[in-house]
Swiss-Prot record:
InterPro entries: Topo_IA, Topo_IA_2, Topo_IA_AS, Topo_IA_cen, Topo_IA_cen_sub1, Topo_IA_cen_sub2, Topo_IA_cen_sub3, Topo_IA_core_domain. Belongs to the type IA topoisomerase family. This is DNA topoisomerase 3-alpha. One of its GO terms (cellular component) is RecQ family helicase-topoisomerase III complex. GO terms for biological process: developmental growth; DNA recombination; DNA repair; DNA topological change; double-strand break repair via homologous recombination; mitochondrial genome maintenance; tissue regeneration. Releases the supercoiling and torsional tension of DNA introduced during the DNA replication and transcription by transiently cleaving and rejoining one strand of the DNA duplex. Introduces a single-strand break via transesterification at a target site in duplex DNA. The scissile phosphodiester is attacked by the catalytic tyrosine of the enzyme, resulting in the formation of a DNA-(5'-phosphotyrosyl)-enzyme intermediate and the expulsion of a 3'-OH DNA strand. The free DNA strand than undergoes passage around the unbroken strand thus removing DNA supercoils. Residues 769-835 have a biased composition (Gly residues). Residues 840-865, 966-994, 1012-1021 have a biased composition (Basic and acidic residues). It catalyses: ATP-independent breakage of single-stranded DNA, followed by passage and rejoining.
Amino acid sequence: MKAVLTCFRPVVASHRRYCANPGQAMKYLNVAEKNDAAKTIAGLLSNGAAQRREGYSVYNKVFDFEAPVRGQNAKMVMTSVSGHMMQLAFQVSYKNWRTVDPRSLFDAPVKKGVGSDYEPIKRTLEREVRGCQGLIIWTDCDREGENIGYEIIDVCRAIKPNISVYRATFSEITTVAVRRALQQLGQPDKRQSDAVDVRTELDLRTGAAITRFQTMRLQRLFPEKIADKLISYGSCQIPTLGFVAERYKEIEAFVSEPFWKIKVLHTIDDLTVEFNWARNRLFDKEACENYLLLCLAEPDPRALVESVTVKPKHKWRPTPLDTVEMEKLGSRKLKLSAKETMTIAEKLYTKGFISYPRTETNQFSKEFALAPLVEMQTGHRDWGAFAQRVIEWGPNPRNGNKSDQAHPPIHPTKLAENLQGNEARVYELVVRHFLACVSKDAVGSETLVHIDIAGEKFTANGLVIHERNYLDVYVYDKWSAKQIHHYENGQRFEPTEVSLHEGATTAPPLLTEADLIALMEKHGIGTDATHAEHINTIKERGYIGVLDKGFLVPGVIGMGLYEGYDAMELALAKPQLRAEFELDLKLICQGQKDPKVVLTEQIAKYKQAYQQITDKITAMDAKISARINETPAANSAVQEGADGSAPSHGIIQSIFQCPKCNEAPLALKPKKNQQGWYIGCNNFPDCKNAVWLPTECKDASVLDECCPTCGDGYRMLKFRLSTPYYRGVFGTPSGWYKTCLPCDNLFRTTFNINLDSVKKVGGIVGEVRGGGGGPGPGPGGGGSGRGAGSGGWSSGPGGGGSGGGGGSGGWGSGTGGGGSGGWGSGTGGGGLGGGKGKKPGGESKKSATKKPPNEPKPKKTKEPKAAPNKKTSSKSSGSIRSFFTSAAPTNSASNGLDEFFDSNDGFEDAMLAAAESVESSSQPKTISMVPLDDDIAAAFAADDDAEFEALVNGGTMPTESNGDQQLDKSLSEWIKEQDKADERPMLWGTRERASLGTAAPTPPPKPAAKRPRWDSVERDSTPPSSVPESETVLCTGCQQPARQNTVRKNGPNLGRLYYKCPKPDECNFFQWADEPPSSAKSKNSTGSAPQSTTSWGSNRVVTLPSIQQSNSQRGQSSMRSNSSSTVTITQTKTKQQERNTATPGDGEEVMCNCGQLASQLTVRKDGPNQGRPFYACPTREKSCGFFKWGDEDQNQGASSTSWGSANRNPPGRSQPTAITSDGPKTRRCGLCRKEGHTRNKCPRKDEFDM
């Protein structure tokens, strides 16, 4: 143990040296809100030793110094921003006023990004943060400052995601305050930042929507007076305008009334005392005259003094200064606007002369040190003496009742004697107010004298000031003494004058900025920090004006807007709506409300208000017209939309939510050349999802009608088809076609529109999203989710895919569930897509929507389920013919194209019937699935080993359903007689099938084996090969079991299996897994029938992917399978033309196997066989399986069939293309394996990237 500890000690020591790194000091990036603040803070922390250098912004310098942080010396880099660095804005798609419906701005995506003017600041932060280990935020300690701090954090963490972030909390920029903040670093408050984000987004959405609507409308209606004006709306601006407009309307509506009152005067030695009538005034002159006659009834009227009262009187000193009071004092005493006052105060704060000017607190805490601040002012020539008196009294502030728990009241932080202009005036106001609030009240005495004349009461008062106290320094308050004669109780005197005086009522005065700020604070409009901004904004808009004496009057347009909102009975002009929102913001800061919930609720309220505006907009038109004296334009009613909005021509029309970004809707937009249409995401450029409509679609528009299948939010698309061919395809003789892209499979297939561009489909892009089947000779598992599930990669029954589509019958043979039949033989389900499985005997269910009785219950998925369009459901049910062929003229004379495409001609049944006798192991029983999380694991959950053994050994299967009793007879007999499928590759065709019957004698039956189970852990196995599973491939050099590998390199052999030497010092052994060894080849060449050749692919056996491939490989294979339902083979133009013109027999009738005249059809699907004629059974319901190419020699028979056989490429594998001698090889895409483009320009590149 001692030896162990001895060895462990140096490791611990080295670890401590690595972690602590005491030789290197920490380096912090400090960021302030303004350059002046950064300069001052750097100077205070460094004792004036900070070194200045330039940043990318010429207005924001960088300062380097050292300072102790939490007891350890650290390197400091101080810089600054210039207020908000990021701006919230709509995406580019919403910038054009004329093409965007204002209503859509309530839900349009917004993005917060750094403005172009602030890029140099951003670059400075990015450069400096790279060499720092910590970030300290020194912005103002309020909501806005916290939000600016998080903007800084976002920029810095984009460069260094794990950087430590700290918050410096301070209320003044003094040496004591900033050093204390540096030693008591905290964390930023995300709640305050969230409150600002909510307010910013709501103001942006509501302001932009209503502003655009009323601006475009009023400009159109009144082109002479408002053509070039912006008629803006703001949730704080309009209520603020309402206060001014209401006062102005009160004055307009005021009617003056005359009144009369009795006045009594008593003069002694040039001192006149006026006694006020207890009745004040009367509006009835006759009654007032009667009272006067009553007082004068006696020839010598005498006044009797009833009481003389003397009581002390105090004039209260002011409470500490907060932001609102400073703005009001600046307006009333300094005649400065609120905006000017706040701008000057912020400058004084950044220079360190006063504390933070944005505060709601008007009380000093008991712990606040007032004496040093007062003593600091004793050296001033104007108020230094009074400050000394306050020191002698002891500072005693008169506190108010408000506190924001963040900042103290506004107070001076240091003496300033060299300020000039308005800065000196504002600084003087702050200092005098501070000294006054911590001094004493003024003290005096008030005398009240009550007299009686003939029963009428009169009163006079006087004031004597004993101690002025705070009035000596606070020159903004006046308290004048009022002298009065000496009176005693019971004294009688003769009044000098008793007379009747006439007056009239006057209207209330216009509002001043101080009055307006008081009203905004009372009703909760804005905050102490935003009052000045709101007032200044409506001034700049021209909604209000300022008269010479500072009185505010509404402008012409401002009054029209207020009256218009009032006529519409709209709450937007009232303060209640905004006051509720301001209260919610406070609750967000306190953590009592969710920001997202508040934003959603407020947007819903403003949506209702917007709807009310559009419904009653004519009321505003009338009010605006009356105020500006202009008649609305005559043609405006014709041009405007139904809701009073601008003309809809050119408006971008939203269709449904983008499935890729889920942040903005897809919208119908004209192409740049105005020659067509496309559907693009409004979240561009962040989302580049787009669907380019073909040129055949003319006059496209978006209907208000929603899709009945997809539901609300999915609007229908309407356009006119320009060509007769597509009119016939879609069954619209008039050419007008209405569709919903997510559920119209026919439209997407016809014009090659990717499903994932219009619908959220999940990880594997495409319609077929089933899971894979089982490995080896087991039954295939059903795929979960919408789309078809693939069956087993090898033999075994294919399980039906749960959800909207069926499962393919398996890459080998098998009894398929619903969906497409297998690429091999067996009783696989017929048709691509959602067709039901084929009954024994070649019967196929026509219905595409009804599930098989034994289909497993679908597994729930998150993807939205969209049923197919009713108009195209039958066409998407799985008929191969509906995709590749159209009826010949002889058969389509009585039936239109619509009827033909809606029919099931049994072509897929013919293909499956022709492949029934392929030699592959199959099991005539569909194993029920249990829904599991893993689709493949669900397919192999059932323990069916006993059934599998009984099937392979020819035993009897237990009867469980009617479907089990209707097994294909030929398949059952073949299973009992032979087991050659394990020795030979699976082929699909006619001549190959015939050759298999005579190639070799039937080997003895093999002992039954347990079905291999799928390993849920190890999935990196390989596809099945031509080598039987019971045999082991030995290396020819070392005679050891060879190692099986898969080709990973892109090319014609991608995914192909091969064997090589397993030893590290490999020998030269190599063998393809899907090709027999050289001995087998030579034996086959001498003893077996020759293999037939077809025009599809090469002659070699095609290998198939294993069920145990990785998920990514299986996803790519599925995508390749979805992209092409047939194999693309390079053909020369000459041979293609020869096939199109050659017909067998030149007029001879072709009969099918059931004795009827065969139907002559033509391949319509794009591909090497497009336009090629062929014959098939005319019976669509019960096809005999007859098929024959029309351009091939009759003597060739079925051996020349290009459908099926092992030459056909299975989905998911990229096979070498057969190149004819008549033409060169055409280059293909490395992703989708189609010609005409490369992988860089592949239209499906995004699918394969996933």
